[in-house]
């Protein structure tokens, strides 16, 4: 397995241009329909049991896309303001984790329908965030522990009301 912009893929055939089978849901939930031959993608191989973890665990199961609303370029860093898909809003917390285009990142300030990400020089230099611009779509994978916690609390609260 490997991931392109955070999208987990299985190779269907190997050769001079690996072939991947993509499910319809993958095409609907990701930015794949918006990329071109010249687009730069973040590529990453699956981790192994002895791989060092440099962030939170990322599965490659994309939950949706977010539109880049603003890019603030600084000397070596960048700040991005990204629209949160409405169905994912409840999973975004200040200092929580999110994977954007496959990169494990920490959430900055959360607004009503958007959030900030502050990219460090290393992330800007080795990812496609170097070329990100307003209007681009970014793949979003919400951190699984956050989803599990929110959903458990919601279920317990509903059971207590009943």
At which residue positions do the language-model features occur?
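Single conserved hydrophobic/aromatic residue that forms the stacking wall/gate
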Residues: 1-20
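A structural feature that tracks compact, well-ordered secondary-structure segments
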Residues: 13-14, 21-22, 71, 90-123, ...
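Ordered, amphipathic secondary-structure segments that act as subunit-interaction surfaces
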Residues: 22-65
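Short, compositionally biased
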Residues: 24-27, 55-66, 111-118, 122, ...
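Short, conserved secondary-structure segments in the cores of folded domains
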Residues: 28-31, 53, 88, 94, ...
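Glycine- and charge-enriched low-complexity intrinsically disordered segments
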Residues: 39, 45-49, 139-144, 151-156
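Anionic-ligand binding region
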Residues: 64-73, 79-82, 88, 94-96
């Amino acid at each position: 397995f490997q991931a392109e912009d955070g999208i987990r893929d299985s190779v269907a055939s190997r050769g001079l241009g690996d072939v991947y089978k993509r499910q319809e849901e993958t095409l609907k939930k990701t930015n794949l329909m918006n990329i071109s031959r010249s687009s730069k993608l973040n590529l990453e191989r699956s981790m192994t049991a002895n791989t060092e973890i440099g962030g939170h665990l990322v599965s490659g199961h994309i939950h949706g896309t977010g539109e880049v609303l603003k890019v603030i370029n600084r000397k070596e860093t960048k700040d991005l303001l990204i629209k949160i898909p409405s169905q994912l809003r409840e999973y975004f917390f200040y200092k929580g984790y999110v994977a954007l285009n496959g990169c494990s990142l920490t959430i900055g300030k959360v607004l009503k329908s958007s959030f900030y990400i502050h990219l460090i020089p290393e992330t800007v230099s080795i990812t496609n965030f170097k070329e990100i611009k307003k209007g681009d779509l970014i793949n979003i994978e919400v951190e699984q522990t956050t989803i599990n916690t929110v959903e458990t609390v919601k279920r317990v609260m509903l059971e207590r009301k009943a």
